[in-house]
Swiss-Prot record:
Subunit-structure text: Complex I is composed of 45 different subunits. This is a component of the flavoprotein-sulfur (FP) fragment of the enzyme.
The organelle targeting sequence, given as a residue range: 1-35
Region listing for Disordered, in residue ranges: 32-67
InterPro entries assigned to the protein according to its UniProt record, in alphabetical order: NDUFV3
Pfam family, one: NDUFV3
Gene Ontology terms: biological process: mitochondrial ATP synthesis coupled electron transport
Lineage: Eukaryota, Metazoa, Chordata, Craniata, Vertebrata
The protein's role, per its UniProt record: Accessory subunit of the mitochondrial membrane respiratory chain NADH dehydrogenase (Complex I), that is believed not to be involved in catalysis. Complex I functions in the transfer of electrons from NADH to the respiratory chain. The immediate electron acceptor for the enzyme is believed to be ubiquinone. May be the terminally assembled subunit of Complex I.
Recorded family membership: Belongs to the complex I NDUFV3 subunit family.
Electron transport listed as a keyword: yes
Name the record gives this protein: NADH dehydrogenase [ubiquinone] flavoprotein 3, mitochondrial
Modified residues (Phosphoserine): 105
Record keyword Electron transport present: yes
Membrane topology term: Peripheral membrane protein
Length: 108
């Protein structure tokens, strides 16, 4: 909703809509947070009630080893001072000419 207001009317309407949405979300979250913590405490105290809950436990995740000494995808980090100019030159053959009205532009 805020995005459509930003596109239609401007920043003030979008800001008002975002603030109103934030108040709505804040109100919803404030009412559900105590309920969710109470239910988690009750489940832990009661334990699994059926056989299926005990069978389908989440597997423990093994942390992946991360090697930070080498970066595998170097194509994004090979920039230099002429990178933009090189790309501009490469893509210039695909550009269309600018449209003109047929009149000469005023020279100041």
């Amino acid at each position: 909703m805020a995005v459509s207001l930003l596109l239609r009317g401007g920043r003030i309407r979008a800001l008002k809509a975002a603030l109103l949405e934030a108040k709505v979300f804040r109100g919803e979250l404030a009412s559900t947070v105590p309920l969710s913590t109470e239910s988690e405490n009750n489940k832990k105290a009661a334990g699994p009630t059926s056989k299926t809950e005990s069978v389908f436990k989440e597997p423990t995740l093994v942390p992946e080893s991360s090697d930070t000494t080498t970066y595998k995808n170097l194509q994004h980090h090979e920039y230099n001072a002429f990178t933009f100019l090189d790309l501009n030159l490469d893509l210039s053959k695909f550009r269309l000419p600018q449209p003109s009205s047929g009149r000469e532009s005023p020279r100041h």
